[in-house]
Amino acid sequence: MKNKKLVVVLLCLMTGRLMAQEAKVTPLMSKDLTDIPGKEGVMITVEYAPGGSDPIHRHNAHAFVYVLEGSIVMQLKGGKEVTLTPGQTFYEGPDDVHIVGRNASSTEPAKFLVVLVKNKGAPVLVPENQAKPK
């Protein structure tokens, strides 16, 4: 009986820790780019809890990243891993696969601003295992 309780408690703790590590995305604005037919600009903030990270993904968009708080680690497929601090920037192109996106700290949160130029109505993030639309 004690072993079952211990297993349940451990599972709850592990699940809570995994859930706490998911990135929090806050949409700030979206605007049709009337002089670029079919495109829109989107602005979001992303917050990583301590130790938080993203799954491997792509944006199928131009993504301009600006670090606001903390320190983040980014890497694109075929590129080098970089650590960014407040005031530093990062760019992802429509064909890039984002293989590393995480908080560099296990004790402090991190927050960054992302401005995307993307196809109107397309999702902001596409998991890497989904095909890129033609």
Where are these regions (language model features)?
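A short, N-terminal "cap"/entry segment at the start of jelly-roll beta-barrel domains
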Residues: K2-V42, Q75, Y91, P109, ...
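Short structured motifs
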Residues: P27-K31, T85, H98-V100
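N-terminal targeting signals for Sec/Tat export/insertion, comprising classic cleavable signal peptides
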Residues: M29-H62
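Short acidic-glycine-tyrosine-enriched beta hairpin
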Residues: L33, P37, Y48, G78-D95
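Extracellular/periplasmic catalytic domains that process cell-envelope and extracellular macromolecules
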Residues: G38, R58, Y66, T83, ...
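Histidine-centered metal-chelating micro-motifs
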Residues: S53-P55, V73, F90, P94-N103
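Short, conserved beta-strand element in jelly-roll/cupin
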Residues: H62-M74
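Ligand-binding loop in jelly-roll beta-barrel domains
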Residues: E81, D96-A122
